[in-house]
Amino acid sequence: MLIGKKHFLTVGAMALAMAIAAPVSAQQKSVAVTAIVEHPALDAVRDGVQDALKAAGYEPGKNLKWQYQSAQGNNGTAAQIARKFVGDKPDAIVAIATPSAQAVVAATKDVPVVYSAVTDPVAAQLVSSMDASGTNVTGVSDLLALDKQVDLIKKIVPNAKRVGIVYNPGEANSVVVVKKLQEILPKSGMSLVEAAAPRSVDVASAARSLIGKVDVIYTNTDNNVVSAYESLVKVGNDAKIPLIASDTDSVKRGGIAALGINYRDLGVQTGKVVVRILKGCLLYTSDAADDSLRV
């Protein structure tokens, strides 16, 4: 928004008066953070954002008001949180994962929105391209080159012909990954076998439906699957189906290998975008995938 000279002088006078009356509150910045669900990858993003803010001198209780709410996997709750945060008028809202980002972007055209852990922000209709958006929306993508993922599958399970994937067909990120795998896998002599898990509680049954049909199960960062990863691991172990992931935390939880984003690093990059906004810089969009690869 452009401010004319007269308006600028008026606002400046008001700000000066507020600074004299309450110098601490006038300097305090406000950041509201929301995630669609709590699981290790998304929690790491949140913590990374805090790391970046602290490194830049912003600390909760001192010069920063920090809010965090999880939607607990519920899109309706995500929308409620988005409306609540917009009403609070923070300096920036950080939306972690596609459903939360979509909810926040739908709720405001004015408050700066920084998305994170979104695989394809264009397909999710958060931005029109990966160039500077020209809107109130920016962020950091966790998009990975799927050909590298396929190479990992071939390296770990050389004889694999059928690759299973459990995913939520209602999550835009996962739909994008499935479509790309359908194109890429045949070039390596493999095919994709899909199993839908619209809710986290559906992950185990979806995985069981793949028994006898696949040689390996690959997981992207589908939020339903990652939040219920242990149930997928149990099915994989019982059926002796190897699990290959696209986030490194899933290896700690039972996957045999992963080529993926370090989500703490992703959060730090996201936090640096927030810091730029707090300092009055222009919004921008970046693709962090190449900088945060971990095997």
Task: Kindly label every feature range from the protein language model.
Residues V49, Y284-V295:
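Single conserved hydrophobic/aromatic residue that forms the stacking wall/gate
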Residues P121-A160, I261-C281:
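Hydrophobic alpha-helical segments within soluble ligand-binding/sensing domains
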Residues L2-V11:
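Bacterial N-terminal signal peptides that target proteins for export
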Residues V11-A19:
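Bacterial N-terminal signal peptides
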Residues V31-Q50, A56, Q67-G76, G170-A172, ...:
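Extracytoplasmic "Venus flytrap"
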Residues W66, S70-S128, T219-N237, I241:
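Beta-alpha junction/loop-to-helix N-cap segments that form part of ligand/metal-binding clefts
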Residues V166, A172-T248:
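Pocket-lining segment of extracytoplasmic ligand-binding domains
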Residues A22-A26:
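Sec/Tat signal peptide C-region and signal peptidase I cleavage site
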